[in-house]
Structure formats: structure tokens, C-alpha cells
Amino acid sequence: MARIAGVNIPNHQHTEIGLTAIFGIGRTRARSICVASGVAFSKKVKDLTDADLEKLREEVGKFVVEGDLRREVTMNIKRLMDLGCYRGVRHRKGLPMRGQRTRTNARTRKGPRRAAQALKK
């Protein structure tokens, strides 16, 4: 298995698909990395030479990926919450922050339904 940016890339996959195993790299960015490094994106990872892998590592190193990207996203959300802006408040409450309706739906953000309390007589 090839190791790029601290991630094991599956050997049986094409280079373009294998690079998407790295957090922060999708299909489009993977294809542009392959083109920039001169590696055929249809080539299997197991068929890559050490020189090819080194070129790929160099190109991937130009982007913010994996732990650094996760940390950056977390810090951005924390900043919004500290500011107390609308999006930060919605993050804090665990509700959708992009204007979706919450009277019904929004189950992914809100989590499973809680049982309603029975009224005492």
C-alpha cells in the first residue's frame, strides 16, 4: 500500500479514486493532482513507481488535507460559536444553520425523537 499524507492508499484502485481516501481530496482535486504530477489517473496504485509516488506526495503537500484540514474546520466552527452569531448559535444548539425548516424534518441534526412527557391529571 502506498502511503501519502499519512493515509494508506488502496493498491487495487486507480490513482484518481485512491487519492480520494485522503480527507480533503475529492475526485476533481485528485484528477488535477494527477495531471500536475504527470501521473496517469487511470493507472492502478500498485503499478506506480517510487518516483510517481514522490511526485504525488509533493502535489498533495501543496493542499491543506487530513489533520490540518479537520483542525481548521473545527476552529472555524468554534470561532462562529464564540462570536455568538446566528450560525454559531445554531451549531451550539445542534440545529440546521442554513435556513432549513425545523418544525418537521431536520432529524439528522436534531437526533432521534424524544418521548413526549405524559400530562399528569
From Swiss-Prot:
One of its GO terms (cellular component) is small ribosomal subunit. GO terms for biological process: translation. It holds the Pfam family Ribosomal_S13. GO terms for molecular function: rRNA binding; structural constituent of ribosome; tRNA binding. Residues 92-121 are annotated as: Disordered. PROSITE patterns: RIBOSOMAL_S13_1, RIBOSOMAL_S13_2. Keywords: Ribonucleoprotein, Ribosomal protein, RNA-binding, rRNA-binding, tRNA-binding. Transmembrane segments: none annotated. InterPro entries: Rbsml_uS13_C, Ribosomal_uS13, Ribosomal_uS13-like_H2TH, Ribosomal_uS13_bac-type, Ribosomal_uS13_CS. Part of the 30S ribosomal subunit. Forms a loose heterodimer with protein S19. Forms two bridges to the 50S subunit in the 70S ribosome. Located at the top of the head of the 30S subunit, it contacts several helices of the 16S rRNA. In the 70S ribosome it contacts the 23S rRNA (bridge B1a) and protein L5 of the 50S subunit (bridge B1b), connecting the 2 subunits; these bridges are implicated in subunit movement. Contacts the tRNAs in the A and P-sites. Belongs to the universal ribosomal protein uS13 family. This is Small ribosomal subunit protein uS13. It comes from Burkholderia thailandensis (strain ATCC 700388 / DSM 13276 / CCUG 48851 / CIP 106301 / E264).
